[in-house]
Structures are given as structure tokens and as C-alpha cells.
Amino acid sequence: MAGRAQGARWMARRVIGLTGGIATGKSTVGRLLAGWGIPVIDADLLAREAVAPGSAALAEIVQHYGSTMLTNAGALDRSALARIIFSDPQERRWVESRIHPSVRAAMQAAVEREPGTICLMIPLLFEAGMTDLVTEIWVVSCKPERQHARLKERDGLDDQAIAARIASQWPLTEKVRHADVVLDNDGDFAHLKIQVERALDQASI
């Protein structure tokens, strides 16, 4: 697939790009891989670090939107920012342009440090243009009704908020179309685990 990592230094190991839709089960797969000793680098955690108190990205966000973006403790008010970025695609792109470069740099550094197989768990793997960092793409998929139910249970979101978050990403069907491995998370944990084990047994793509 075009844009995938190339060159001799990538051929000796696998760089798994783990992605999917919101609340489809990416973290569950990540925990499975980590439990088997595979380093898992979480883009969401890196994004949080990118806007930590004192960071340049947080300063830019506050300058752009005002001090209402901060909690009383001086941290980013994620709920306040979410209300903006999930209602305005242009503002979402502006915020992402302040965060994604540092996330990408950290991912690249992790790949260069790790000589063996590594997993980059990146929800916006396609949207952020990071497919060139990986040698294969795994997409965790589930039916829309299960995705909605998980978002309601996990995040307490209403239907409008759920729709906005899902619409902010590529359609799951499109991600599946670009995947090397599709993990169906409509069944139970045992079913998902078997699929992950099989994917690991595959030869590097």
C-alpha cells in the first residue's frame, strides 16, 4: 500500500499501526499485545503530553481560545475544547495541527528505538497521515449499534455528541478497506483474542 514504511531498516520487524473507529476496541487489542510483550505506543497519551501545563501547544490553544480553556489547576479543560472541535471541523484541524507534529515525532522516535515488533496505536492513523510510520495496518471494527452503546456507557455521551465524534473521523468502512488486518469486535473477548493471535502469526506484510 502506498505510503507504507519502506527500506531495509523496516524489513526485519513489524511496525503495526493499530486503529479503528471510536470505541471499537482498540485499547483492548493494545492491552493484549502489551501482555504478550509487544511495546504499544498510545497516540492518545502522547497527545495529552503535548498539551500538558507549560507546553507550547497549550499556550497556543489558550491564546487562540482564551483562558476558558483552562481548569482551575491550569490544565487543559478537555470538555471545553471538545465542544469546540467536534462542532467545527476547521477549528478541529487547527487544534490537530498544534498537536499532531509532536505525536508523530514521538512515534517516530519510538520506532527507531525499538529493534523488534512494535505497535503504534493511533486512532487518527489515516486522518493524520501517519501510515508511512507503519509496515502493516490493523483496524478494529464493530457494528454501529455496538459502537454507540459503548460510547454511551463509557463516556456518557448523548446521540448528538456521539454522531459528532464519529463524523470527525474517516468512516469505519473506509478504514476497513485500507486495512491489512481487520479485527471483528462484535463478539466476546475470546473471539477477539483469537483474531489477534492469528494476526500476530501472519508473516510481516
From Swiss-Prot:
<keyword id="KW-0547">Nucleotide-binding</keyword>
<feature type="binding site">
    <location>
        <begin position="23"/>
        <end position="28"/>
    </location>
    <ligand>
        <name>ATP</name>
    </ligand>
</feature>
<dbReference type="InterPro" id="IPR027417">
    <property type="entry name" value="P-loop_NTPase"/>
</dbReference>
<dbReference type="GO" id="GO:0004140">
    <property type="term" value="F:dephospho-CoA kinase activity"/>
</dbReference>
<dbReference type="InterPro" id="IPR001977">
    <property type="entry name" value="Depp_CoAkinase"/>
</dbReference>
<protein>
    <recommendedName>
        <fullName>Dephospho-CoA kinase</fullName>
        <ecNumber>2.7.1.24</ecNumber>
    </recommendedName>
</protein>
<dbReference type="Pfam" id="PF01121">
    <property type="entry name" value="CoaE"/>
</dbReference>
<dbReference type="GO" id="GO:0005524">
    <property type="term" value="F:ATP binding"/>
</dbReference>
<keyword id="KW-0418">Kinase</keyword>
<keyword id="KW-0067">ATP-binding</keyword>
<keyword id="KW-0173">Coenzyme A biosynthesis</keyword>
<comment type="pathway">
    <text>Cofactor biosynthesis; coenzyme A biosynthesis; CoA from (R)-pantothenate: step 5/5.</text>
</comment>
<comment type="similarity">
    <text>Belongs to the CoaE family.</text>
</comment>
<keyword id="KW-0963">Cytoplasm</keyword>
<comment type="function">
    <text>Catalyzes the phosphorylation of the 3'-hydroxyl group of dephosphocoenzyme A to form coenzyme A.</text>
</comment>
<feature type="domain" description="DPCK">
    <location>
        <begin position="15"/>
        <end position="205"/>
    </location>
</feature>
<dbReference type="GO" id="GO:0015937">
    <property type="term" value="P:coenzyme A biosynthetic process"/>
</dbReference>
<keyword id="KW-0808">Transferase</keyword>
<dbReference type="GO" id="GO:0005737">
    <property type="term" value="C:cytoplasm"/>
</dbReference>
